[in-house]
Amino acid sequence: DLLSRVLAKLLISAFAPTGIIYLAVDDTLCRKRGLTVYGTGMHHDPLISSRAKPLVSWGHDWVVLTLIVVGPFWSPSKVWSLPIGFRLYRNRQGLTKGKKGRKAKTKRRNPNHRTRPELAVELISLVAGWFPERTFVISAFPLVLGIARSTNPRSPTCSLRYGV
């Protein structure tokens, strides 16, 4: 969190020193090989999936909070999304069906396990706590918006929108 805080303060002071801070949050799959890589698992892969056939890939699933920069001086006609916070999503292993179709033994839910939307709300709350006097407009996937509205991020001036 220290790296994220330093990066957020640096980027926000450079690109949004006053006014509204525009943020976006989403998750991304980074494919990795090897069973010994920490934090990897089988995750839904939207790039190779279709509506008819959902597919999965082995890798890291990162939840990333980004600062939206519209028309910076080096690229006035573009919109940039600069990462300022991140969390590694780790799925619950062992609760899926095996090759023979038998349901795995259900384990107790790990109280430390957090879903992607919970991680996104955690990132939003963290950044809102660093800049309590600022107003945020956050673009996120719908489930994050529902959780964020029910848990109220720290900043009372936080507007949530779906899509950019």
Model-inferred region functions:
Residues 1-164:
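Conserved, well-structured functional cores that handle cations and Mg-NTP chemistry
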